[in-house]
Regions:
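Conserved catalytic-core motifs of eukaryotic protein kinase domains, centered on the activation segment
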Residues: 14-20, 78-81, 169
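Helix-loop "lid/cap" segments that line or gate small-molecule binding pockets
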Residues: 87-94, 102-115, 123, 139, ...
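Flexible "cap/lid" loop of the alpha/beta hydrolase fold
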Residues: 54-59, 63-100
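Structural signature of beta-strand start/N-cap positions in the alpha/beta core
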Residues: 2, 37-42, 63-66, 157
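Conserved serine/cysteine hydrolase catalytic core
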Residues: 126-178
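Active-site loop/oxyanion-hole signature of alpha/beta-hydrolase fold enzymes
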Residues: 4-44, 48, 52
Length: 178
């Protein structure tokens, strides 16, 4: 048994791509399985990663032995919840910030939650972001969206965040259908 931690495309040190659709990200996961010669795996995905592993159920269900989706539902959220975050990230990109401390100072002009700032700063290294900001902004409708896929007929664990708006009773039918 082993664990493979995947940075999704346009995040961390993963390859950059102009496309951020869930079918494309599911293919990335399948390519990762193939690259590591893994026939079947249990997938645990958080947020966008959770949607990517759900999309994998439509692409290669035979390769999935278990699925856990954390703080995400298989729905189109129709809401831009992250505009303030993008504003903070862009402000840092346009500033002369070269350290996390300087970047945090710029971000506090746009964001109130220190936990969110510190989480984002994990991806600020050597004066630059480790995610592809222009593509994430451009592809945002695909990231918050969701195309209905066939139900995966195996148990799936959905874990909501404590005060999260992403897994609520309003999405119960979508969770049961997935």
């Amino acid at each position: 048994h082993g664990i493979v931690q995947v940075d999704m495309r346009n995040h961390g040190l993963s390859p950059r791509s102009p496309e951020m659709t869930y079918p494309a990200m599911a293919q990335d996961l399948l390519d990762t399985l193939d690259a590591h010669q893994i026939e079947r795996a249990t997938f645990i995905g958080h947020s966008m990663g959770g949607k990517a592993v759900m999309a994998l159920t439509a692409l290669a269900p035979e390769r999935i032995s278990g699925l856990v989706a954390i703080d995400i539902a298989p729905v189109d959220y129709h809401v831009r919840r992250h505009d303030e975050i993008f504003a903070a990230i862009r402000a840092v990109s346009e500033s002369a910030a070269s350290t996390r401390q300087q970047a945090a100072q710029v971000m506090r002009e746009h964001l109130q939650e220190e936990g969110v700032i510190q989480f984002l700063l994990k991806s600020f290294v050597d004066g630059d972001w480790r995610f592809n900001v222009p593509v994430l902004w451009d592809q945002y409708p695909h990231i918050v969206g969701w195309e209905t896929i066939p139900a995966w007929p195996h148990p799936t664990q959905f874990i909501p965040g404590g005060n999260s708006p992403y897994v609520t009773d309003a999405y119960r039918d979508a969770l049961l259908a997935q």
